[in-house]
């Protein structure tokens, strides 16, 4: 098993629906996960308002989700999916049956875990990290600055 799949397997063992997908290429594999978009298309198109923004992350309120897949179509990164989960449906006061409910599934940065995202914690190669937007913007600025100085003499206008 690849290292990325190992991380997914470890998370799944905790009865957890993986919210990270591995895209395999010929020589490399990469993890694809929700980008927590600033103006999240998935949240904007949800007819029930089930995708909610809370501080630094978006999550799905499963009580509101109807499993319509509109969010799946809207996600520009292909990271939204609809999964079926077993639920108990009450037929009468005395009778219940097991049924399945379709619901949206997306990364919510494991907001319920004090340790942060489970995938980051269990990744055997430490290839997964979480950084906030400000830190990402700072990294981009620094890389651009370095690139400008490294090629500075070569640029003539």
From Swiss-Prot:
CDD domains: HycB_like. SUPFAM superfamilies: 4Fe-4S ferredoxins. Signal peptide: none annotated. GO terms for molecular function: 4 iron, 4 sulfur cluster binding; metal ion binding. [4Fe-4S] cluster 3 binds at residues 34, 37, 42, 75. This is Frd operon probable iron-sulfur subunit A. [4Fe-4S] cluster 4 binds at residues 46, 65, 68, 71. Pfam families: Fer4. [4Fe-4S] cluster 1 binds at residue 123. [4Fe-4S] cluster 2 binds at residues 107, 110, 119. Residues 24-55, 56-85, 100-133 form the 4Fe-4S ferredoxin-type domain. Keywords: 4Fe-4S, Iron, Iron-sulfur, Metal-binding, Repeat. The keyword Repeat applies.
């Amino acid at each position: 098993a690849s290292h990325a799949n190992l991380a997914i397997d470890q998370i799944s063992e905790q009865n957890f629906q993986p919210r990270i997908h591995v895209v395999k290429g010929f020589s490399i594999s990469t993890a694809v996960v929700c980008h927590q978009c600033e103006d999240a298309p998935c949240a904007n198109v949800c007819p029930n308002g089930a995708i909610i923004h809370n501080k630094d992350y978006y999550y799905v309120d499963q009580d509101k989700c109807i499993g319509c897949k509109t969010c799946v179509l809207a996600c520009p990164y292909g990271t939204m999916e609809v999964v079926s989960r077993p639920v108990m449906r009450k037929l009468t006061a005395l009778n219940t049956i097991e049924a399945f409910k379709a619901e949206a599934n997306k990364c919510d940065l494991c907001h319920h875990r004090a340790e942060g995202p489970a995938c980051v914690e269990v990744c055997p190669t430490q290839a997964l990290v979480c950084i906030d937007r400000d830190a990402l913007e700072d990294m981009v600025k620094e890389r651009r600055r370095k690139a400008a100085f490294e090629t500075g003499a070569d640029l003539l206008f």
